[in-house]
Design a protein with these regions (language model features):
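Mobile late-domain/C-terminal helix-loop "cap" segments
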Residues: 140-188
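Residue-level recognition of alpha-helical structural elements
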Residues: 17-20, 49, 78-81, 139-140, ...
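Short, amphipathic C-terminal "tail helix"
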Residues: 180, 185-186, 193-212
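Mg2+-dependent prenyl diphosphate-binding active-site environment of isoprenoid biosynthetic enzymes
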Residues: 1-141, 179, 205
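Short amphipathic alpha-helical boundary/capping segments
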Residues: 132, 189-190
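A short structural micro-motif
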Residues: 30-31, 91, 149-153, 166-167, ...
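Short, charged, amphipathic alpha-helical segments
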Residues: 86, 175, 198-202
């Protein structure tokens, strides 16, 4: 199904001209590169947080950036506005993924319909986990031990999730998410005040603060 959808998207973009096809191809390359990096551990000597954020820029940011770029391009905007919207879209995409990661940790399953701790069980180091692993407080030693081990066991997963939810790393990850949202809104500064600008600003708030 994914291949079919990608093929249909390519068919539609082909009707928009050579530049649109090139933009789609470049986004696809970034997406694939991001997925490859996501499937591999952070290289020794690299900062795990910077590595992870780079993955999100490629995997998710590139897609939303392309959508925003297309909207501005085919809406007749100037080149400056097209670039502005692409940058806005990229940060919106990163903020969306960061917020989604937090939902997996801190949300109420009865509200979201999602099972908390799915990423932990699968060994995915999201931003809050990376922050927790970087911690040095002796009181958090048990959490760091759990996060560095296998969490497929239900009891270990439940313990790790409870400890992580109470750890400052979650709020730190939330602050980072909001900071990315602030960057996205700031990029809209040069645009004239309008309903469209207000909607783009509100969209960032909705993405950053969502709970499910």
């Amino acid at each position: 199904v994914g291949d079919l959808l990608f093929g249909k998207a390519s068919e539609l973009v082909a009707g928009l001209g050579a530049e649109a096809v090139l933009i789609q191809a470049q986004a696809f390359v970034r997406l694939c590169a991001g997925q490859i990096r996501d499937d591999r551990p952070c290289p020794p000597g690299d900062d795990p947080v910077d590595y992870y954020l780079g993955v999100l820029h490629d995997k998710t940011g590139s897609l939303i950036a392309t959508a925003a770029r297309y909207g501005a391009m085919f809406g007749g905007c100037s080149d400056d506005v097209v670039e502005l919207m692409a940058a806005y879209g990229e940060r919106l995409g990163v903020a969306f993924q960061l917020a989604d990661d937090l939902i997996d940790i801190a949300s109420d399953a009865t509200e979201t319909g999602k099972t908390p701790g799915t990423d932990l069980r699968e060994g995915v180091d999201t931003l809050a986990v990376l922050y927790a692993k970087q911690g040095t407080d002796p009181a958090d030693a048990r959490l760091r031990e759990l996060l560095s081990g296998d969490l497929r066991d239900d009891d270990r997963l439940a313990e790790a999730l409870a400890l992580l939810q109470a750890n400052p790393a979650v709020e730190r990850a939330r602050e980072t998410t909001r900071a990315v949202g602030v960057e996205a809104v700031a990029l809209l500064g040069p645009l004239p005040e309008s309903d469209a600008k207000a909607a783009l600003t509100a969209l960032v708030t909705s993405v950053v603060e969502r709970v499910g």
